[in-house]
Structure formats: C-alpha cells, structure tokens
C-alpha cells in the first residue's frame, strides 16, 4: 500500500498532477513511461501502425485479431431502428423544441437502463457498436476491446461532456451549484485540478484509514446491527451496506459521524435524476420530474442533514485551505465534499457491497470456502491484499459483475476508429457522444468463459485475467516489466490506494461475524444487466456468529 501523505505534501502532489497530461494511475502501482502519441486515431500508440492485413493493436494484444490475414473492416455503427422509424424521427424533428420523441426516449431508457441497450444491440444485429436515441443521440459500445480503448484514451481523443451530467442523466442543480466534482468534470471544466484536490484530500487522511475502518465497523456491529437482528423486516440489504460504508467514509474523510440512514439512502437516489435531452420540451419534462421527485422524497431536508455535518467537520477548514493552495475554487466546497463522501463513497461502494451480500446468500459453497480461508482473526486494511487468494478472486469477480458506474459517457474530440473484439473498427465522428455500457463490456465471451455467470473462483484459475477487469474504471496499459493500470477518469478512491482493500475488509469481516439468509432469490446467474439486485431485498434470517472479535 502507498505511504501516507501529509497535508504539507499536497502541493507536490498537485504539481505532479498538473504537469503531466497522462493517465491517472493507482497510488499502489509503479509509474511507467507513457506511450508516444498514436499516428492513427483510435489505435493506441507504442506499437507501429498496422500494416495492411494486420489486426489493430488492441486486437493483437488481446488475442482478438481478425481471422486469417483479412484486413480489419472499417464500419459505420449500425442503427438499432428501422429506416421507417428513423424517417418518422426525422419528420418529428421538424417540430423543433416541442418534438416529443426525445422526452419519450429518455424516459424509456432511464426506467430500463441496461435492458434497453441489450434490446437495441439485438435490433442492430448483435454488433458491438451501434447508434441509438436515449434522449440524446449516442454511439453505444458493448464489448471489451471497445471499452478498453474508451477508458484508456487520452482526453485529446475522448473527453467528458462540458456539463454536470452523464449523457441524459443530469445532476440536480441544487446539489452542486458552482461545485464541479471530478466525477462530472471534463478537462475543459477543470478536471485535472479537481482530481488533484480529490486525491490530495484522500492522501491527507491515508494514515487514518485503518483506525477509521476499525472504529466505524465497531460502531455498526455494536450499535446498529442489534436492531437489525431484532427487526430484520425493517431494513433492506442496501440499508445495511450504506450504514457500513457511510460510517467509514464520514469517519475517514471528515472525522465525524454520518447523517441518518434515511439521509444516506436518499442522497445518491435523488442526485442523478435531472433528465436532459436534445431539445427544450424533453429537458423541461425531465427537470420537472426531477423537482417533483425531490419534493416527494424530502430531499432538500435530508441533504441539508449531511451538509450540516460536512460544514461542522473540524477538517473542513483544512480542506478549504488545501483547495485555495491548489487554485481550486472554494465556492460551494461543502457541496463538493458532500458529493465526494456520499455519492462517490457511500453509493459507489455501498450499492456493490449489497450485491456481494446478496450473491453470497445464493452461493453457500463459496461462502463456506471464504470463511475457512479468512478464519477468525481481525482483517486489517494494510494486510488484507495478497493474503487470501479466494477473497481476492471474489473481489475481482465482484468488480467485473457489479462495479459502477454502469454507464460512462464521453465526447469524441476528433474523428476516431473504435476497435472491437472481433477485429473490426467503427467510425465515430468528432463531437459525437459515446456511451460505454460497462456491464455488457465486462461480459465479453472472447475474454471471459461463461461471462454471464458469477464465478468467485474465476481468477484463481487464471490470475493474469485480473488485468482484463476494468478495475474501478482502470484498464491494463502496458507491461514494463509488470502490468500497469491506467485511466484518464478512473476512480480517485482507487488511485488513492483504498478501494479494493476497503471492500475486502468489509465483506470479509461480514462473513466472519454474520449468518444470514435473504427473503428472496436473486437472479444474478445469467444476469448481464449489472443490476445490484432488488433495491428492497431484505433478510429473512440474520444473526451474529461466534466468535466475535
């Protein structure tokens, strides 16, 4: 694990972040030289430009070269709609700002997120790259090679949108105001400085990770879980997961206690709901629905609860001075910190932790093996990595199957050719919006055997396969001499050296201390949508195990 960074080291960290126009790397990984610029848009550099008849660089690296010596085909992304439907869409566009189709498209997509991509891919003939309308026209990528290119490309090729949104999914304006968290910032809107501040905040608290994790788990197991044991019908699996992660995140980054469970649960749900489309009517409908949703769930009151805790943290002034030193605006810094802690942290880890608990309720043999492996000794953040092979494999399969975000959007900054696992290239034009449907990309049968099945032992049998998992948004970049992971917009929590070990300690301690059964069966086997299980799934049986520690 990386050494702890003192606050006094933050200026050096920022200088390193701002003076390099390279991909961000996890703190725990060694630095490596960057590849020289590619001469062919859409083909990562370092290797020579392919000769006629050769596979694209990415295809050769992954073993997905075209059959024989055929030259890679350069294709236009297929449409998922028939010509008749596209003609009707064109005619409807004449109505301009009152065209109802963008509103219909975005509502249909937002209520059936990943399945809409699956249906559209089938309608487009099963190709890995296709065009569709989800309130905005997008090019959707759905296989491993295209996602690897998408995640690993520099911002000169692909950059975030210039707005606080993920495609049509906008952040409610009242939740951020002038703040621009790195999760929604492009290079044009200050992503480099923001990410430097995000990582610096985490590094300044790195030496407190283990103690914060120990204290937060003790509080939850001693004070919160007895209530769950007595009244399991009053808590969902997500409630319990959010409580564990929320207790840790607020203790670690703010040295305080979290808001109520209701406030923890409500913030991520009501954050990304401001639907935005390509015309006035669709955006108006989406914004109106956002305001109604927030009013119905009392979001303003619940969010104010968390915001008050942020403002009264003893570390708030430290972070404000840190932001000033780095040249980052301190306007709405409280909202920025709340987004970092509650959305990136609590929702980002909490949702997927709930999925792991649900999976293990179905895979009892895996649960038994994990219990034998981890034993009864307390798990520590600084020693859990590399000590438990099955737990490690389970963690990578967890990331492959469930890790968010499920969709990532970027804008093409130039004309590109996107490689795919079948060796073909797909044209994307400058300014087109690309959406990576990551659950589909992580279930590419050319990379993973039985990709739609959750297999906790997958990486025991083939440890090198770990490098093909998009680990917190990171991808394998090169071998020099060991594999190195990189990502322009990868998770800052992972960059700070925290993400994977945090999950292992949380789920490892859970299986040591808890016996449980769920009130329903979860259909994760064969599920390629990346869903985290029914949001209201509960425990039918839950009780403490012995011995405790």
Swiss-Prot record:
Gene Ontology cellular-component terms listed: mitochondrion
Name assigned to this protein: Mitochondrial hydroperoxide bicyclase CYP50918A1
The organism of origin for this protein: Plasmodiophora brassicae (Clubroot disease agent)
Similarity comment: Belongs to the cytochrome P450 family.
Record field: compositional bias (Low complexity): 27-41
GO terms for MF: heme binding; iron ion binding; lyase activity; monooxygenase activity; oxidoreductase activity, acting on paired donors, with incorporation or reduction of molecular oxygen
Pathway info: Lipid metabolism; oxylipin biosynthesis
Record-listed heme binding positions: 491
PANTHER family: ALLENE OXIDE SYNTHASE, CHLOROPLASTIC, CYTOCHROME P450 26
């Amino acid at each position: 694990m990386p050494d702890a960074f003192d606050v006094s080291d933050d200026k050096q960290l920022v200088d390193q972040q701002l003076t390099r126009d390279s991909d961000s790397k996890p703190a725990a990984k060694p630095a490596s030289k960057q590849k020289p610029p590619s001469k062919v848009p859409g083909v990562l550099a370092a290797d020579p430009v392919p000769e006629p008849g050769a596979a694209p660089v990415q295809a050769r690296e992954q073993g997905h070269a075209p059959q024989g010596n055929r030259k890679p085909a350069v294709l236009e992304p297929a449409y998922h709609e028939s010509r008749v439907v596209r003609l009707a869409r064109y005619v409807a566009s004449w109505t301009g700002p009152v065209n109802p189709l963008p509103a219909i498209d975005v509502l249909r997509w937002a209520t059936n997120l990943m399945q809409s991509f699956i249906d559209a891919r089938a309608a487009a003939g099963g190709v890995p790259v296709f065009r569709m309308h989800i309130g905005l026209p997008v090019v959707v990528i759905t296989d491993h090679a295209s996602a690897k290119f998408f995640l690993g490309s520099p911002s000169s090729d692909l950059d975030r949108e210039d707005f606080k949104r993920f495609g049509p999914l906008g952040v409610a304006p009242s939740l951020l105001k002038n703040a621009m968290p790195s999760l929604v910032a492009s290079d044009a809107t200050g992503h480099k400085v923001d990410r430097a501040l995000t990582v610096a905040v985490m590094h300044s608290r790195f030496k407190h990770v283990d103690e914060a994790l120990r204290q937060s788990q003790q509080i939850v197991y001693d004070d919160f879980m007895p209530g769950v044991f007595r009244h399991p019908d009053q808590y969902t699996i997500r409630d319990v997961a959010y409580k564990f992660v929320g207790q840790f995140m607020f203790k670690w980054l703010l040295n305080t206690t979290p808001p109520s469970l209701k406030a923890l649960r409500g913030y991520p749900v009501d954050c990304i709901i401001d639907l935005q489309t390509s015309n006035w009517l669709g955006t108006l409908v989406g914004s109106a629905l956002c305001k109604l949703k927030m009013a119905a769930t009392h979001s303003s009151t619940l969010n104010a609860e968390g915001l008050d805790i942020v403002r009264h943290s003893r570390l708030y002034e430290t972070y404000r001075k840190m932001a000033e030193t780095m040249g980052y605006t301190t306007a709405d810094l409280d909202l920025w910190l709340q987004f970092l802690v509650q959305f990136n942290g609590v929702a980002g880890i909490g949702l997927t932790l709930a999925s792991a608990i649900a999976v293990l309720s179905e895979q009892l043999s895996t649960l038994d093996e994990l219990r034998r492996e981890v034993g009864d000794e307390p798990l520590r953040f600084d020693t859990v990595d590399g000590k438990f092979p099955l737990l490690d494999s389970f963690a990578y399969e967890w990331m492959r199957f469930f890790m968010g975000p499920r969709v990532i959007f970027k804008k093409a900054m130039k004309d590109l050719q996107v490689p795919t696992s079948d060796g073909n290239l797909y044209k994307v034009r400058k300014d087109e919006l690309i959406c990576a449907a990551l659950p589909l990309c992580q279930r590419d049968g050319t990379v993973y055997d039985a990709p739609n099945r959750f297999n906790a032992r997958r990486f025991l049998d083939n440890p090198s396969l770990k490098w093909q998992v998009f680990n917190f948004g990171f991808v394998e970049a090169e071998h020099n001499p060991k594999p190195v992971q990189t990502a322009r917009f990868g998770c800052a929590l992972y960059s700070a050296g925290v993400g994977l070990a945090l999950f292992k300690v949380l789920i490892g301690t859970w299986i040591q201390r808890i016996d449980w059964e769920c009130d329903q069966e979860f259909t994760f086997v064969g599920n390629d949508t990346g869903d985290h299980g029914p949001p209201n799934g509960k425990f039918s049986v839950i009780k403490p195990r012995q011995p405790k520690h």
